[in-house]
């Protein structure tokens, strides 16, 4: 177990994920967690994350100083290195010039850099700088701009690095993290097989012979959860609410795959109910609230008619847990659609087997449980479905237009081998009509926007650089096969400033 103490870095979750990729279990705690809270987890090593603050700020977040004399192996990254150096008597100064972007380690030595030869590219992002290590510590790496790029304690159990080994822009960063894990003697048994074994044991012990209810959306999290319950042999009912806002053939695909793998699945046809409630509504937030309300009503009806159930299983992931426990206010970006808001007379105990897992770990479990790749590798899809990709009022006619266009875009991505190279791809039907030409006549057709992004964690995202030849083929095929669409555009906006979805 390795604990990552979070000082506000945008890369904190990435550090935890990288450690798990190296098969070391990791958890994230607030940077100011007291020593007692840290030791309760029985960690084999600690990592102090980076952060946006300066160690000279009066209210800068700081760790419990007792951590530095706890004897635990320690790695400070960027701001974490500056905290470590300052606390132990080194010298930290406000840098005359900030160091951002790629840099080269022109010198590196010692076991933390074992296996690395020559100049090593790293990613810097700091303003303050350690200019002298603590007494007895050694400088073990430097760049042309920074003579103190990494430091090591006298006993070789604690290190600080001014760069970010966790990011892709430090190509040998995983080797550095792996070296630290070896130096710390951290256990490396966090394999998908081990995780599955532990989850099956947990679910069987917790649920016993009691009944479990869960909602299935067709996404990888809920589908994998349904398979886990089936594999564990617990008495479960998976409810798939067809709200009429699904993609082309989605209901049939989900139904066929899950039933074939032993999931006790109930499909609720609620298309008419949802479309009636959405009639005339154009505001995106209002659409989300209506869909959430109607989903709860449909799901609650099943719970009453098929109950009683003791447990409600949910596919809550570790990032959800981190955000809930963060304690730092954040502006509401969008209303989130979930099974929350159930009536008070429906009381369940929550069963959340994935609460300590990241999305990529759930995908690994899905592979072990036999979930077809068409579902396992499926891009994220919003709970409100196509309702937030049909801008303006949602009608059956506009949904059908979008379904056909979206299917063409997705199929073409697969044909070109691009689907798995982007994190999310979608089509958006705008309420704008544009003039075009059909034969010798002018016609007005809808404007369709295509969007594809690449991202590590969905917190930020970059627009995908799809080949122009691909985009040309997509536009031609869509306008040819979906005559209601007269113009196709491609969204070049990253997140931020935009969100991935348009609504």
UniProtKB/Swiss-Prot annotation:
Keywords from the UniProt entry: ATP-binding, Glutamine amidotransferase, GMP biosynthesis, Ligase, Nucleotide-binding, Purine biosynthesis
GO annotation, cellular component aspect: cytosol
Active-site residues (renumbered): 78, 164, 166
Disulfide bond entries: none
EC number: 6.3.5.2
SUPFAM superfamilies on file: Adenine nucleotide alpha hydrolases-like (SSF52402), Class I glutamine amidotransferase-like (SSF52317), GMP synthetase C-terminal dimerisation domain (SSF54810)
Superkingdom as given in the UniProt entry: Bacteria
A GO term, aspect molecular function: ATP binding
Pathway: Purine metabolism; GMP biosynthesis; GMP from XMP (L-Gln route): step 1/1
Glutamine amidotransferase type-1 domain sequence ranges: 1-189
First-tier enzyme category under EC: ligase
Span of the signal peptide: none
Catalytic activity from the UniProt record: XMP + L-glutamine + ATP + H2O = GMP + L-glutamate + AMP + diphosphate + 2 H(+)
Domain GMPS ATP-PPase span(s) in chain numbering: 190-378
Binding site for ATP: 217-223
Assembly notes: Homodimer.
Function noted in UniProt: Catalyzes the synthesis of GMP from XMP.
HAMAP family registered for this protein in UniProt: GMP_synthase (MF_00344)
The protein, known as: GMP synthase [glutamine-hydrolyzing]
Protein's organism: Thermus thermophilus (strain ATCC BAA-163 / DSM 7039 / HB27)
């Amino acid at each position: 177990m390795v604990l990552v103490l979070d000082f506000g870095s945008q890369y904190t979750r990435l550090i935890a994920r990288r450690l798990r990729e190296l098969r070391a279990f990791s958890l994230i705690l607030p940077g100011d967690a007291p020593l007692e809270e840290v030791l309760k987890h029985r960690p084999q090593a600690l990592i102090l994350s980076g952060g946006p603050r300066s160690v000279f700020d009066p209210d800068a977040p700081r760790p419990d100083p007792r951590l530095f004399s706890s004897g635990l192996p320690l790695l400070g990254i960027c701001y974490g290195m500056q905290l470590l150096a300052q606390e132990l008597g080194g010298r930290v100064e406000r840098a005359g010039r900030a160091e951002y972007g790629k840099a080269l380690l022109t010198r590196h030595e010692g076991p933390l850099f074992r296996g690395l030869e020559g100049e090593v590219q790293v990613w810097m992002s700091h303003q303050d700088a350690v200019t002298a290590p603590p007494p007895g510590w050694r400088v073990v790496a430097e760049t042309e701009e920074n003579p103190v790029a990494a430091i090591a304690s006298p006993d070789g159990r604690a290190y600080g690095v001014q760069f970010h080994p966790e990011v892709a822009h430090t190509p040998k960063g995983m080797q550095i993290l792996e070296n630290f894990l070896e130096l710390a003697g951290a256990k490396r048994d966090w394999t998908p097989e081990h995780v599955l074994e532990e989850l099956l044991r947990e679910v069987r012990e917790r649920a016993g012979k009691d009944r479990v209810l869960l909602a299935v959306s067709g996404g990888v999290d809920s589908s994998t959860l349904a398979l886990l319950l089936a594999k564990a042999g617990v008495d479960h009912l998976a409810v798939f609410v067809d709200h009429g806002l699904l993609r082309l053939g989605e209901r049939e695909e989900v139904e066929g795959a899950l039933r074939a793998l032993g999931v006790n699945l109930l499909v609720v046809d609620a298309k008419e109910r949802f479309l009636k409630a959405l009639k005339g509504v154009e505001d995106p937030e209002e659409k989300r609230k209506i869909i959430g309300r109607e989903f709860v009503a449909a799901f609650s009806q099943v719970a009453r008619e098929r109950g009683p159930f003791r447990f409600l299983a949910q596919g809550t992931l570790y990032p959800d847990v981190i955000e809930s426990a963060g304690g730092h206010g954040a502006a509401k970006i969008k209303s989130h659609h979930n099974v929350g808001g159930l009536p008070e007379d429906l009381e369940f105990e929550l069963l959340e087997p994935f609460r300590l897992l990241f999305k990529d770990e759930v995908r690994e479990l899905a592979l072990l449980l036999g979930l077809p790749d068409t579902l396992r590798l499926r891009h994220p899809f919003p709970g409100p479905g196509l309702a937030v990709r049909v801008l303006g009022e949602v009608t059956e006619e506009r949904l059908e237009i979008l379904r056909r266009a979206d299917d063409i875009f997705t199929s073409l991505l697969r044909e070109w081998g691009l689907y798995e190279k982007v994190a999310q791809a979608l089509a958006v039907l705008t309420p704008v009509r544009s003039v075009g030409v059909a034969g010798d006549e002018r016609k007005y057709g809808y404007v369709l926007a295509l969007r594809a992004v690449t991202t590590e964690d969905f917190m930020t995202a970059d627009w995908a650089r799809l080949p122009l030849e691909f985009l040309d083929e997509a536009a031609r095929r869509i306008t040819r096969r979906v005559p209601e669409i007269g113009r196709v555009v491609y969204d070049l906006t990253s997140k931020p400033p935009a969100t991935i979805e348009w609504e």
